[in-house]
């Protein structure tokens, strides 16, 4: 299929995509703008249609006093057991939170706030249906990527927090996403602070039976 970049023209930074059957859904940062976090839909990853917004009420998105490039940072969209989840950071308000909806065409929930600092949160479900949160953070004075089990409906933290990566020598480890394939866990992060040394980094972790006990 022929395509022309940009496939979604305009202001759409920090995209996150999830697949549900034959459908793809994409969200992106909106910073100081309202409504927040648009949802795009595609069947071929080339032609995209705007479906709506995750954050379209002030009770979901408080931007009073927001500076330029404040507000909503780096959302992640996920789908699990019939429910969509969007997790993000409002750097102008209370920090990290997650909202959910059983349909991208419906209303999204009120925010479930998460007691964890940092930015760029994402969610990962393991094979046992446990949900894990990861984001940037500081633990025991060490800066890196923090992870723990979470209830994604309420934001309740269900396990001890663990520092799972300090990066691999680059500046500002951020943007973490955890994936699992063939019994192996993969952590993907960005480093370099979006400047000249910016780069993507991928880690291969221990096999499933060795790793779950560590989280």
Indicate residue ranges for each PLM-predicted region.
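Conserved small/polar residues in nucleotide/adenosyl-binding loops
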Residues: 204-211
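Structural motif
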Residues: 35-38, 94-97, 142-146, 196-202
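Beta-propeller fold detector
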Residues: 50-55, 110-115, 158-164, 212-213
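Beta-propeller domains
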Residues: 29-54
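Hydrophobic core segments of beta-strands in well-ordered, beta-rich domains
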Residues: 16-33, 66, 73-91, 110-114, ...
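Surface loop/turn motifs at the tips and blade-to-blade linkers of beta-strand repeat domains
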Residues: 7-10, 67-68, 113-116, 165-170
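Blade-loop segments of beta-propeller domains
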Residues: 50-80
């Amino acid at each position: 299929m022929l395509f022309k970049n940009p496939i979604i023209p305009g202001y759409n930074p920090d995209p996150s995509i999830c697949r549900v059957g034959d459908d793809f859904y994409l969200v992106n940062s909106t910073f100081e703008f309202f409504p927040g976090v648009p949802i795009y839909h595609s069947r071929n990853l080339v032609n995209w249609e705007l479906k709506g917004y995750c954050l379209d009420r002030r009770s979901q998105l408080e931007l009073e006093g927001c500076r330029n490039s404040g507000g909503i940072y780096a959302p992640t969209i996920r789908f699990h057991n019939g429910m969509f989840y969007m997790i993000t950071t409002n750097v102008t308000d209370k920090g990290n939170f997650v909202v959910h909806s059983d349909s991208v065409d419906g209303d999204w929930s009120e925010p479930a706030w998460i007691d964890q600092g940092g930015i760029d949160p994402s969610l990962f479900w393991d094979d046992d249906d446990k949900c894990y949160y990861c984001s940037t953070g500081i633990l025991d004075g060490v800066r890196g990527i923090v992870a723990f089990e979470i209830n994604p409906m309420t934001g309740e933290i269900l396990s001890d927090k663990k520092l799972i990566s300090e990066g691999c020598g680059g500046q500002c480890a951020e943007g973490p996403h955890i994936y699992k394939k063939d019994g192996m866990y993969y952590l993907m992060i960005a480093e370099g602070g979006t400047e000249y040394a910016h780069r993507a980094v991928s880690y291969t972790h221990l096999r499933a039976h060795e790793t779950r006990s560590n989280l």
